[in-house]
């Protein structure tokens, strides 16, 4: 007779069960750590994107507020009060006071060391007279051409009933607003020129986020500046009325969206695709998976 198979001893069974328990525990721990890591990286990636939206929109809002402060300061300047009212004034003194009040070379106006947010500003009084200040020097011939352009913009604006008026030309956006004296009576017009290069610099980090979009508009949806994706998605972005931070479907993808109103009727909208979060997780986790 053949001998029957020898049954495993209790010790062998115990070792097997112990090893099995260790392996299963290690697998469970590894899976748990992976899930926690993915959750952590996801939160971190989302936080980074939200910080970018908040930081960039904050920088833009700060510069628009600086514009508002400039315009408000004009009616409180004793020399410019007389100019705005069309009363007797010293032309040279008015120009100097206007340049000092607007101060286009201030840190508040600079996006970087070479890019002013406002590159030129004109103030017209009731009589159609003007003073101006500009960041870049101009030839006499070009100054005369610029004066004519701003006079035409002023004339077109005053024919409208709008509080604000916008025009884009030659990679610039012109923002027009009515100026009031201390009695809040309409006394003139201020025209501010914003250069595209400075605005592009302010939003330059969006190039690091594929498929991201941003859009700057006037109060009636006129596009002042936008990146290519922003132009493509302008209609859908402008349909979003609940401004602030939210998740919105734009095109075929979900996005982290920010929309906000600033001064002079200007609005900013930005959107970053949510799939950037997963792309960030992938790039972070991938080295450990190899």
Please tell me what each predicted stretch does.
Residues 147-162, 236-249:
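Soluble sensory domains of the PAS superfamily and closely related sensory modules
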Residues 133, 141-150, 168-207, 268-273:
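Conserved beta-strands of PAS-like sensory domains
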């Amino acid at each position: 007779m053949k001998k029957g198979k020898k049954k495993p001893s209790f010790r062998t069974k115990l070792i097997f069960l112990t090893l099995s328990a260790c392996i299963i525990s290690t697998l469970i721990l590894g899976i748990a750590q992976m899930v926690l890591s993915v959750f952590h990286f996801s939160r971190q990636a989302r936080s980074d994107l939200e910080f970018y939206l908040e930081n960039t929109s904050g920088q833009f809002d700060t510069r628009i507020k600086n514009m508002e402060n400039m315009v408000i300061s004009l009616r409180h300047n004793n020399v410019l009060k007389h100019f705005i009212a069309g009363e007797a004034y010293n032309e040279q003194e008015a120009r100097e006071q206007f340049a000092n009040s607007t101060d286009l070379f201030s840190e508040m106006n600079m996006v970087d060391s070479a890019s002013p947010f406002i590159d030129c500003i004109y103030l017209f009084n009731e009589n159609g007279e003007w003073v101006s200040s500009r960041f870049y020097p101009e030839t006499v011939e070009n100054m005369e051409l610029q004066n004519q352009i701003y006079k035409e913009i002023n004339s077109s604006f005053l024919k409208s009933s709008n509080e604000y008026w916008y025009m884009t030309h030659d990679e610039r956006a012109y923002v027009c607003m009515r100026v009031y004296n201390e009695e809040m009576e309409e006394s003139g017009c201020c025209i501010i020129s914003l250069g595209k290069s400075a605005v592009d610099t302010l939003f330059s980090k969006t190039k690091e986020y594929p498929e991201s979009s941003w859009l700057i508009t006037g109060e009636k949806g006129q596009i002042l500046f936008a990146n290519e994706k922003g132009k493509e998605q302008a209609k859908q972005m402008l349909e979003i009325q609940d401004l602030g931070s939210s998740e919105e479907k734009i095109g075929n993808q979900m996005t982290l969206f920010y929309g906000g109103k600033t001064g002079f009727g200007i609005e900013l909208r930005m959107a970053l695709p949510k799939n950037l979060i997963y792309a960030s997780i992938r790039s972070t986790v991938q080295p450990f998976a190899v």
